[in-house]
């Protein structure tokens, strides 16, 4: 945010609504009238005035991503399956080994779409006007849960074809939904850290009151596909907010085991539990470019799964049968741009 040279207004970057591109705006002073300076599909950051002029300098960021599929036993044999501009940028999951659900914004809204890997165009299953993200397939592929911004983040459920959409949570805000491949329930993180019993919650896909799973305040979770174990990240407020990562059994049959050293919270939130293994697949750039690596929960050394030399990985999913890997993969390009105030 910066004052104009005449002191009659402010320049700032902001979104008109959640999920929209970040644009440059002018707010006049003192009446507070708002005027849009840019109006396109790019994102702008760090708006400022060029030296000795009224021209605006900003950083324009262009993000592109599409869905790619590879066999789990040969993850470098990867093939592109969608052509959208930002496919999977805000989440993706397998409905079946032959069908992917993912975030998309070809319509200008952040929708959820589904595509069959055997061919055919993608179909929107949750569309405007809300901003949808973090799709997770539940109940043996019959249901999709996701976060929808409806005056706050709340979790919704729809049938896999986009019918029978219903809101499942109604608190201050709810994020990071996870669910087992089989079973009609989900776990999520409540944004209300003061909620009784802890903010790691469990709810039925049929609706009703959610309940606490563990008495911790958590900031990220990851659920095994069999629904028996859950990883959670929490901050130890008695120890300089040190992050701890614990593994808990959903039925309480074993005490919480804390991992030492813990994986980073990004690995925990964005990684995926490998079917049949005590390990996560996650994105790491230690090789020089973002690639998939394994993080063992039993102390085994990490293993590199892919060997890309360029590009970004924005998200990943593993099919329930363990046969396929899906990636949201693309690029981020940034350029400095100059705008005349007459624009």
Predicted features along the sequence, with ranges:
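Conserved beta-propeller blade repeats
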Residues: 1-15, 20, 40-59, 83-103, ...
